[in-house]
Amino acid sequence: MKENLTNLFEKVIKLPTTSGCYKMLNENKKILYIGKAKNLRSRVKSYFLEKNSHKIKILMKNVKSIEVITTNSEYEALLLECNLIKTHKPDYNVKLKDGKGYPMVRITHEKYPRIFKTRKIINDKSEYFGPFTNVKKLDQVLDFINKTFKIRKCKKKSNAPCLYYHMGQCLGVCYKENLEKEYQKELDKAKSILNGNISEISSQIDIKLKHAIQKEDFETAIKLKEIRNSLIEINQIQIVTKTNNLNIDYVHVHPGENVNTIIVLKYRNGKLVERDANFDESICKENELILQFLIQYYTSINMIVPDKIHIFLKDIDTKNVEKLINEIKNTKTEIIYKETEEILKIMEMAISNAELSLREYENKSTKALESLKIVLEMDKLPKIIEGFDIAHLKGQETVASMVTFKMGMPFKENYRLYKLNSLLKGEIDDFKAIKEVISRRYSEIINNNLELPNLILIDGGKGQLNAALSILKGLKIENKVKVCSLAKKQETIFLTTNKKGINLPQGHPALRILQNVRDEAHRKANGFNKKRREKITLLYTKIHGIGEKTAQKILKSIGTYKDILPLSENEISEKIKVNVQLAKRIKEFAIKENSIKNNNQDK
């Protein structure tokens, strides 16, 4: 590794000092990370420092080459970086996972507005109230408001009264005419409550509560008391700030050991309406992370850009990011940083929200793992899961992937890709492929005295499970690690202790974890196989007279250059339906490639 980094560094110190973008690639030419820089040489050199974080060191362990694209300005570099990340989606760049924000109340912009709970803001002149942290109490209040003020529930106009009208919970606006004034009067009362004016309605509830107690109608009394308490609570938690009625987002980055949390507190007309939590596993530093986040978040199709975006990081040049957002979204937003007593309070709230969101995120994973532990009859929590998948195209370029999940989340630093050698050309044998990859992975662990995972997941059914188990038995570790398989069609979980298999309902937290691991392993294996095939196809297009279609035909019908070597020119011609002259060039190319490879091995 040190030798590789030394060779890389020698190339890096020769990079231009202009602005531009850099791509970090692994040995298979897969892009791991994309960044931009004002000074390419200076920025890329910083990745070789000893004081870098663990994540950056893991990245650099896998980097085998660095490519750069120079630009005329820093803004052009930013624009290029944005496009490259969207195109390639590198593993080590920012990939946001949305957290579930607290719900709000939406009053629609219609002739007869409806009132309901939502987690999305739509720019259609609707009014929003909230957010509300206690969903149960919010549901109680909304139910009370809708019934008391007879708010419309139906989405479409009808020729007949709805069920709610017959129950006395609707004015009948779905079929009656000219009720605008009467409806608006009731709607204003509902809005008043949502704005925190609850003294009048609380007094009315208290009177009803006393009557219910006098009549010994304790069931009604309990319900009325719950509604009154819910009204008081939900109107205490709405936090208002003096923002001169502007729409402002406050963005806070909360770095974590494995997961970074980015909180967006959204204020509309001076009132906090939403807390949006996002989670990121990239290697980006705090300054770089917030800039990448702002671009991805605010340039997405459905995102409404506010008047101002306030960040809590000082001395960051956001002019280019601001310009890019405004150009893409046709807005006039400002990205600002200020220090006032009021903003410091908002910052404290953002930090506590970030910590809360991270705990919720981690707790969700822990509960799912507890569920998985019970389903698989494990003694310990499956904190570390390693998942395997095989990929090939009609027996060509068979490869395997191994992914690692720690506490239910991808741990990309530990991913592995394998070129399999035990299968013959055109041979399709998942069992043999699984045996090879399991043998290679766990021989490596035993030989290097590394930690075993708690759970091994194989993509497949009983046969694939037994193939893996036979290798684990040979290595004498079958009792040290739990192993299971997940069959695709029925999503059946197979265990060595359960021959019939386990079928969990869709959405079950234990099944969801296994599906996530399986799907990630599948994605990595297929991606690796595709890259291998593309590399070979590209190689064949260097032969004079060979286009992409013929190159693909060579790959499918014959295979790699090694598979071409034993064939005669006539055999090549017959297999891929080309003339003998072209077949001769293909044969010569294969001999030349083989000679180059042999010479490289001798050095």
Curated annotation (Swiss-Prot):
Subcellular location: Cytoplasm
Gene3D superfamilies linked to this entry: 5' to 3' exonuclease, C-terminal subdomain, GIY-YIG endonuclease, UvrC, RNAse H endonuclease domain
GO cellular component terms listed in the entry, alphabetical order: cytoplasm; excinuclease repair complex
SUPFAM superfamilies: GIY-YIG endonuclease, RuvA domain 2-like
Domain GIY-YIG: 17-94
Keyword flag DNA damage: yes
Cross-referenced InterPro entries: GIY-YIG_endonuc, GIY-YIG_endonuc_sf, GIY-YIG_UvrC_Cho, RuvA_2-like, UvrABC_protein_C, UvrC, UvrC_RNase_H_dom, UvrC_RNase_H_dom_sf
Range of residues in the leader sequence: none
Superkingdom: Bacteria
One Pfam family linked to the record: UvrC_RNaseH_dom
Listed GO MF terms: DNA binding; excinuclease ABC activity
GO biological process: nucleotide-excision repair; SOS response
Key words, A-Z: Cytoplasm, DNA damage, DNA excision, DNA repair, Excision nuclease, SOS response
Main subcellular localisation: cytoplasm
Keyword Cytoplasm appears in the UniProt entry: yes
Subunit structure: Interacts with UvrB in an incision complex.
Family, similarity comment: Belongs to the UvrC family.
HAMAP family named among the record's database cross-references: UvrC
Role played: The UvrABC repair system catalyzes the recognition and processing of DNA lesions. UvrC both incises the 5' and 3' sides of the lesion. The N-terminal half is responsible for the 3' incision and the C-terminal half is responsible for the 5' incision.
Annotated PANTHER family: UVRABC SYSTEM PROTEIN C, UVRC/OXIDOREDUCTASE
Name of the protein this chain belongs to: UvrABC system protein C
Organism: Borreliella burgdorferi (strain ATCC 35210 / DSM 4680 / CIP 102532 / B31)
Protein encoded by which gene: uvrC
